[in-house]
Structures are given as structure tokens and as C-alpha cells.
Amino acid sequence: GVAGVDLIPAVSAHEADRWMARATATLASLRPGGYDYAYPTKILASLAQGTPVIYAGPGQAAHDVVEAGLGVACSLDVDEIAEAMVAFASGSAPWVGAEAVRAWVRKHRSVEASSCSAAMVVRSAL
């Protein structure tokens, strides 16, 4: 293994929350070309714990991570991912802070926010 990097087997959601809450950053990835429209829920789980994310992949998630200061977005490339890990370990990665990311999740990606967006689409079709 790599010093300072913990790779753990699959655990319950409760246990995963505990690990994410203590992490310096979490890593979520999505292979390009397959599910570019998908939004990895690992990102939201990490941010809900107030932990920044390294997102390696395409799509809206990459845009959100960069634009909102939720962590680092990069391509699915081992060197870019390693650079992001080093940036978090050294304290130089962009990050708006735990409370700001929790507020961003509530405003943009919560069940309430998604429900309001869906309702607006339905209303606009009437």
C-alpha cells in the first residue's frame, strides 16, 4: 500500500460515513464514455460529511466540484489523481470548507432541491 492511504473493503453505509467524516478527502470516479450523465452519489456522501472530494471523471459532477470549490476534479488518470491527493495532503487544494459544502449540497443536490427542480419542469409543461 501507500503510506497515508487507506483502502478498505466494502462496509455498511454507517461505517462508510464514519470513514468519510475522518478523511482528508475522498475519491470518486466515473469511467468516461459510459455514464457521462451520471452523478456519483459518493460525491454527495462525502460532502454531507463535510469532507472534500477528488472526482476523477466527466460530466456535471466535475463542473460542480470545480465551480463550487468542493474539491478537485481531474480526468481518470493516475498521475492527476495522485497530484490531487498530494494537494489535499499538503493543504494546497481548493476547498470552501465543511459548512459551505453542506450548504451547497442542500441548495443544489438535496432531495428538496431535486424535487423543486422536477416540479418546475412539470409546471412548465402545463
Please name every model-derived segment.
Residues 1-17:
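Nucleotide-activated donor-binding/catalytic signature segment of Leloir-type glycosyltransferases, i.e.
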Residues 2-4, 50, 70:
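A generic structural signal for alpha->beta connector loops
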Residues 12-19, 26-44, 54-63:
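Nucleotide-sugar-dependent
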Residues 18, 76-78, 92-122:
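A charged, aromatic-enriched C-terminal amphipathic alpha-helix characteristic of glycosyltransferases
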Residues 24, 50-51:
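A short alpha->beta transition loop at the rim of the catalytic pocket in nucleotide-sugar-dependent
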Residues 67-79, 86-93:
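Conserved acidic donor-binding segment of nucleotide-sugar-dependent glycosyltransferases
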